[in-house]
Amino acid sequence: MLNTLWEIREKVRDLSPLVVNLTNNVVTNFTANVLLAAGASPIMSEGVEEADDLVKIANAVVINIGTLHSRQVEYFKKAVYLANKYQKPLLLDPVGLGATTYRNETTFELLNSGNFTLIRGNYGEISFLAGNSAQVKGVDSQTSDFAAENLTEVAKRYKTVVVATGPVDYVIAEGELYLNRTGDIMLQKVTGTGCALTSLIGAFVGVIDEPALAALAALAFYGAASEKARKISAGPGSFLVNFIDSLYNLTKEEFLELTTEKVQGLR
């Protein structure tokens, strides 16, 4: 399996998929740099007027609700419609879902307005989507009692691939369940690493027709790069720089070493 995951990573570098990001203004720069380092081509867009032109040429479209406002929501709705119209992979990152009524209403409105290829969130966000309405304390909620059943519920309800990231990353789709245990805790010390991960998953989904396997490849690659970076970093500042470098220069040999016995397919 690990060799297959690396082949997907190489496809990203070879094909340089165009990822249209409708993301939040906290993470725009970091997300673009993550995509570039991995070999993808990012577009960071805020103007609904260019939606049709961009979605038409995209290999994937990523919606991130991190810094939510009404003008952005208008763009989100149009992007959902256009991605479905042009049959483009469409990903949702419901940042902070469960924290405010506005985020909750917007997320459910988007999910009910079209078909999403994949939803990625942390344990708290995915649990909320599944109907467990405990208050989410922040955008980095890592609820320790997360149950994999939450993914099954969300995947069935929205007919999509669901990715929940935390101490163990879960990927579920119909007939598929994967676990990933790569990743360093330093990722939690740099803002935007989850948001950038969703966009990176978009790049991987954009090069093969198996979104669950593509998501697993992105998770394993991202986590392995973070582990490599941590080894030569003194703290969050140097880690940030070293992480971008690791995404760029991680070798197959390093990937296989860092992912062995950390990636599983359960069915």
UniProtKB/Swiss-Prot annotation:
The gene is thiM. NCBIfam families: PRK09355.1, thiM. GO terms for molecular function: ATP binding; hydroxyethylthiazole kinase activity; magnesium ion binding. Keywords: ATP-binding, Kinase, Magnesium, Metal-binding, Nucleotide-binding, Thiamine biosynthesis, Transferase. It catalyses: 5-(2-hydroxyethyl)-4-methylthiazole + ATP = 4-methyl-5-(2-phosphooxyethyl)-thiazole + ADP + H(+). Substrate binds at M44, G192. SUPFAM superfamilies: Ribokinase-like. This is Hydroxyethylthiazole kinase. Pathway: Cofactor biosynthesis; thiamine diphosphate biosynthesis; 4-methyl-5-(2-phosphoethyl)-thiazole from 5-(2-hydroxyethyl)-4-methylthiazole: step 1/1. Belongs to the Thz kinase family. It holds the Pfam family HK. Catalyzes the phosphorylation of the hydroxyl group of 4-methyl-5-beta-hydroxyethylthiazole (THZ). GO terms for biological process: thiamine biosynthetic process; thiamine diphosphate biosynthetic process. The keyword Hydrolase does not apply. Its cofactor is Mg(2+). InterPro entries: Hyethyz_kinase (IPR000417), Ribokinase-like (IPR029056).
